Amino acid sequence: MKIQADSIVARKSYNCDILFRVVHIHEDSQIVDLIGEEMRLSADAPLSDLVLMPEEEKNKLRNQLKKKVDRSFRLFRQDFKLLQQKREYVSTGGYKHDERYFELPGKVLHVDGDNRYLEKCLQLYEKLGVPVVGVHMSEADMPQRVPKLLDQVRPDVLVITGHDAFLKMKGGKKDLQAYRHSKHFVRTVKEVRTKIRHLDQLVIFAGACQSHFESLIKAGANFASSPERVNIHALDPVYIVSKICLTSFMDRVHVMDVLRNTLSNEGGLGGVETRGLLRTGMPIEKDLEKQEDLPSN
């Protein structure tokens, strides 16, 4: 078979460690634009360095990642149940009774430079019970378009992500111009923070694979990638912000508590201590619950 757009390939020079999807082949230079199949990585490579992955090898790599994804989901659900038990105890004053209470988690605006990743993320938000509005746009359009979306959606949390990469030939790790899309993420965060300055009023996650972590945090992001300029998984932003959305506003979330259930951990992700967003209320009548569709315990 011939390598073409949408082919799933790997790079021989990197021991075929990551699956990529072919975006475009430049016929004149024989350079191929690539995006990670599961990682938020943007790259290019000579056509001669690429190999079509056999179905068996693709499934092997996908299954390895799926085990990590399933583990992260299990750990997150365990944490969520513990948080839920704590909230129920606090809401009822430690007494057992038949009253039902409702929960209002933080609302997410998830802006993604990759439409396929966006769909995967939206499915995970739904499984975790986090309200979300998802928007697909190119990373370059984000600085201009995202601030306008805030007025329409009025989110508690903003996710700014897509693809990125550190390009050694363009400069050192401290040089923002040596990154494919970090400058767009940084500009977006700065624009948003001119509207909403307080870190607990709007929680921001920004970045993708190998992004310029320090610049994103300095611009005003609560959480960002990538401290060690490593790759992050497509679903990592979801786990980070969902932890904030489902933690009581009475509690502060420590960075390690957020990172331990992600697929990338502290090498790929970091941030600052942030207040939770979830609020509980009671009572709620069963017929009203059905009518208003309030999320209940």
Residue ranges with predicted function:
Residues 2-4:
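Short, well-ordered loop/turn sites that connect or cap secondary structure elements
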Residues 16-26:
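Short beta-strand-centered aromatic/proline hotspots
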Residues 22, 30-40, 45:
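SH3/SH3-like beta-barrel fold
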Residues 38-94:
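Intrinsically disordered, low-complexity, charged/polar segments
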Residues 137-140, 227-236:
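Short, acidic/turn-prone active-site loops that include or flank metal/cofactor-
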Residues 150-163, 221:
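Proline-aspartate-enriched helix->loop->beta-strand connector
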Residues 186-232:
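Catalytic cores of nucleophile-dependent amide-cleaving enzymes
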Residues 204-219, 277-297:
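Charge-patterned, long linear interaction tracts outside catalytic cores
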